[in-house]
C-alpha cells in the first residue's frame, strides 16, 4: 500500500525496469519477468477501514540473475538509498537492500550455493 501510488510505481519502473500491466489513479500493477507487484492507495475503499494504515517492517525479495550489475546500476543513481551493501550470506544469497517508497525495504537477491551448515535446510526439488 502507498500514500503516493504514482511515485511508488515510478520508482519500480524507472529504477528497476518494471512494466505496467494495469494503471489507475489508485492502483498500479507492475511486472518484471515472472515477478508481479501491485501498488494500491492505502486509503482506497477496497481496503477495510481498520487496515488502511501504511504497513511497517515489510521487506520484498526480488531475485535477479546478476545482483552485481543491478547493484552497480542502482549505486550510481544518487536518488537510490542503499541501506545494506552487497554481501554474501552463508544461507545461499548474494544480496543488497535498498529503501523503496512508503518504508518498504527491497532485498535484491542472487541465489548462491549455501554453506554446508544451511544446505540441509533447503527442500529438494
Task: Tell where the protein language model's regions lie, with residue ranges.
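Structured catalytic cores of enzymes that bind and process phosphorylated ligands/cofactors
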Residues: 104-109
Amino acid at each position: 500500500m502507498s500514500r503516493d501510488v504514482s511515485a511508488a510505481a515510478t520508482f519500480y519502473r524507472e529504477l528497476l525496469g518494471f512494466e505496467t500491466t494495469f494503471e489507475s489513479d489508485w492502483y498500479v500493477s507492475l511486472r518484471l519477468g515472472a515477478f508481479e507487484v501491485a501498488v494500491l492507495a492505502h486509503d482506497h475503499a477496497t481496503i477495510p477501514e481498520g487496515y488502511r494504515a501504511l504497513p511497517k517492517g515489510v521487506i520484498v525479495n526480488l531475485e535477479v540473475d546478476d545482483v552485481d550489475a543491478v547493484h552497480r546500476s542502482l549505486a550510481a543513481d544518487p536518488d537510490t538509498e542503499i541501506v545494506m551493501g552487497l554481501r554474501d550470506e552463508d544461507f545461499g544469497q548474494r544480496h543488497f537492500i535498498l529503501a523503496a517508497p512508503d518504508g518498504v525495504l527491497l532485498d535484491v537477491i542472487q541465489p548462491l550455493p549455501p554453506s554446508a551448515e544451511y544446505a540441509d535446510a533447503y527442500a529438494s526439488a
